[in-house]
Amino acid sequence: MKLTCVIVAVLFLTAWTFVMADDPRDGPDTAVRGGKRFWKARNEMNSAASKLNKRECLEADYYCVLPFVGNGMCCSGICVFVCIAQKY
């Protein structure tokens, strides 16, 4: 009996999730229940202002922790316990 109730509850919640999910093909006017609000928030996001996009790198002669090429910490990409400048 308990197992049956759990199965029914899981099926109900799964169906509810699919019914209430936002369909990106719908425009902001055709969405159900406050779809405009979510659509507007999605469009107002400024991904260029994200701190995750701004990675600072270490200049030459700074300690770089991970000694291998291409670790992303050094601007040159070469690290042998200190960042090594690349000569072009």
From Swiss-Prot:
GO terms for cellular component: extracellular region. Keywords: Cleavage on pair of basic residues, Disulfide bond, Knottin, Neurotoxin, Secreted, Signal, Toxin. The keyword Calcium does not apply. GO terms for molecular function: ion channel inhibitor activity; toxin activity. InterPro entries: Conotoxin (IPR004214). Belongs to the conotoxin O1 superfamily. The presence of a 'disulfide through disulfide knot' structurally defines this protein as a knottin. The cysteine framework is VI/VII (C-C-CC-C-C). This is Conotoxin MaIr34.
